[in-house]
C-alpha cells in the first residue's frame, strides 16, 4: 500500500506540477493571418499602409502550480516558421533618403520561443501601431 501511495504521489508531482491553461482550442491556433500594417520614414512626407501576412493565434502554454518549488516554464509564442520579405516604396522622399521599406511575409507559423531578433515579444498594446504622418493607403509591393 505504501508503494502505491508513493507512486501516486510521484505521478501527481510529475503531472500536476503544471496545469495546462487550456485543454482544447478555445481560440484560433497559431497560423498566418492577413494584417494591415503601416510604414513611414521621418524624412518622407507620408505614411503607407499595406496588407501582409503575419503569425497570430493561440499557443498552448503551461503554468506551474508550485512556482517556488519548480523552475519557470518557458511560454511559447506564435512566430514565423517560414517567411519571405517584401518591400514597399514610400513616395515623395527627398533625394538621398532610401524610400524602400522591407517587411516579413509569413508563409507558415509555429509555436516556439520568442526570438527578439525576429519578433516583437511584447504583449498586447494599448493602441495599435499607427502613423505619425498622413496615411497613403494601398501601395503595391515592389
UniProtKB/Swiss-Prot annotation:
Transmembrane segments: none annotated. Keywords: Disulfide bond, Glycoprotein, Hormone, Secreted, Signal. This is Lutropin subunit beta. Promotes spermatogenesis and ovulation by stimulating the testes and ovaries to synthesize steroids. One of its GO terms (biological process) is G protein-coupled receptor signaling pathway. Glycans are attached at residue 34. Pfam families: Cys_knot. It is found in: Secreted. The gene is LHB. PROSITE patterns: GLYCO_HORMONE_BETA_1, GLYCO_HORMONE_BETA_2. Heterodimer of a common alpha chain and a unique beta chain which confers biological specificity to thyrotropin, lutropin, follitropin and gonadotropin. Belongs to the glycoprotein hormones subunit beta family.
Amino acid at each position: 500500500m505504501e508503494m502505491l501511495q508513493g507512486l501516486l504521489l510521484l505521478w501527481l508531482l510529475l503531472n500536476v506540477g503544471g496545469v495546462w491553461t487550456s485543454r482544447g482550442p478555445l481560440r484560433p491556433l497559431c497560423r498566418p493571418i492577413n494584417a494591415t500594417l503601416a510604414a513611414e520614414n521621418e524624412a518622407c512626407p507620408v505614411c503607407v499602409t499595406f496588407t501582409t501576412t503575419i503569425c497570430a493565434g493561440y499557443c498552448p502554454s503551461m503554468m506551474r502550480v508550485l512556482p517556488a518549488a519548480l523552475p519557470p516554464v518557458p511560454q511559447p509564442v506564435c512566430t514565423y516558421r517560414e517567411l519571405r520579405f517584401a518591400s514597399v516604396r514610400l513616395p515623395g522622399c527627398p533625394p538621398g533618403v532610401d524610400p524602400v521599406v522591407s517587411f516579413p511575409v509569413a508563409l507558415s507559423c509555429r509555436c516556439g520561443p520568442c526570438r527578439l531578433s525576429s519578433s516583437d515579444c511584447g504583449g498586447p498594446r494599448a493602441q495599435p501601431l499607427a502613423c505619425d504622418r498622413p496615411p497613403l493607403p494601398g501601395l503595391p509591393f515592389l
